[in-house]
């Protein structure tokens, strides 16, 4: 199961990313763009052969969500609470091969609720139990890529300011059939503070060689490193080049849509 980086930032009791090293206090912002040469179209998720055993398991899981307002395989998570006048039927699910392993997965997203209840879960089929197992458990701000997830933080209350919204990267591990934490990305604007009292670290002027007034923080395996803008843009291009977001076929969690999975 995906250990959701510290990205969980209290959301959905996740553990999808390494824990941020700075307390977060400021509002959202735009991300520094990387130059692109074309406006590519979004790839579709793959269409594997239909597995009715898997679909039946997904159908049962969705009925647990719809009828019991509970997350399958998360017995201690409590009830799903949806803010009125909305209902669970306003929330979303999809059945598609999102991880590229040739088998369908079940994605369930609940967002019309309190912050810590907002989450997206990717379930895979477990033929040993004829049930479902969790491949990824994260906050709702997920962009799906082939073999990769980009998960936005639930809050931007650190020192990133208007440089970027913090996010985590997780990669699909075929051997484990689940997503694994890789990176947590944040930023530090010198105008907000030139000293991080939490880590007792002064602003790294030696890293900010372009005198941009901000640096990026990449956390990997619990270790944090600083990057200036030029180095970050190269690093970011290495992560996202030739990867386009997948189009996920979301639909509402209605009785009719659940029943239509297997007839």
Task: Tell where the protein language model's regions lie, with residue ranges.
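Sec-dependent signal peptide recognition
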Residues: 1-4
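C-terminal motif of bacterial Sec signal peptides marking the signal peptidase cleavage site
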Residues: 8-11
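Acidic, small-residue rich beta-repeat scaffolds with periodic aromatic anchors
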Residues: 14-35, 39-64, 154-263
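Blade-edge motifs of beta-propeller repeat domains
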Residues: 47-87, 129-141
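Beta-propeller blade termini
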Residues: 89-98, 140-150
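Acidic/hydrophobic-patterned starts of short beta strands in beta-sheet-rich repeat architectures
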Residues: 100-110, 147-155
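Short glycine/acidic-enriched loop and turn motifs that connect beta-strands
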Residues: 112-115, 158-160
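Beta-propeller blade repeat segments, especially FG-GAP/WD-type strand-to-loop junctions
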Residues: 117-135, 170-173
């Amino acid at each position: 199961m995906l250990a959701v980086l510290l990205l969980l930032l209290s959301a959905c009791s996740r553990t999808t990313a390494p824990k941020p090293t700075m307390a977060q206090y400021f509002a959202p912002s735009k991300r520094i763009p990387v130059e692109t040469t074309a406006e590519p179209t979004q790839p579709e998720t793959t269409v594997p052969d239909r597995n009715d055993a898997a679909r039946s398991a997904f159908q049962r899981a969705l009925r647990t969500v719809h009828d019991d307002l509970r997350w399958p395989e998360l017995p201690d998570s409590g009830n799903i609470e949806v803010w009125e006048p909305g209902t669970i039927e306003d929330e979303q699910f999809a059945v598609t091969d999102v991880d590229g392993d040739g088998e369908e997965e079940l994605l369930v997203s609940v967002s019309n609720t309190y912050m810590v209840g907002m989450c997206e879960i990717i379930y895979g089929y477990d033929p040993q139990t004829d049930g479902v197992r969790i491949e990824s458990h994260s906050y709702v701000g997920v962009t799906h890529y082939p073999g990769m997830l980009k998960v936005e933080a639930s809050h931007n209350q650190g020192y990133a300011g208007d440089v970027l919204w913090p996010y985590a990267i997780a990669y699909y591990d075929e051997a484990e059939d689940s997503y694994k934490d890789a990176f947590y990305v944040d930023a530090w604007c010198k105008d907000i503070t030139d000293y991080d009292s939490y880590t007792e670290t002064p602003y790294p002027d030696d890293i900010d060689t372009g005198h941009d007034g901000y640096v990026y923080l990449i956390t990997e395996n619990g270790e944090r490193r600083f990057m200036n803008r030029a180095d970050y843009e190269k690093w970011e291009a290495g992560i996202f080049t030739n990867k386009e977001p997948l189009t996920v076929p979301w639909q509402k969690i209605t009785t009719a849509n659940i029943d239509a999975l297997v007839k």
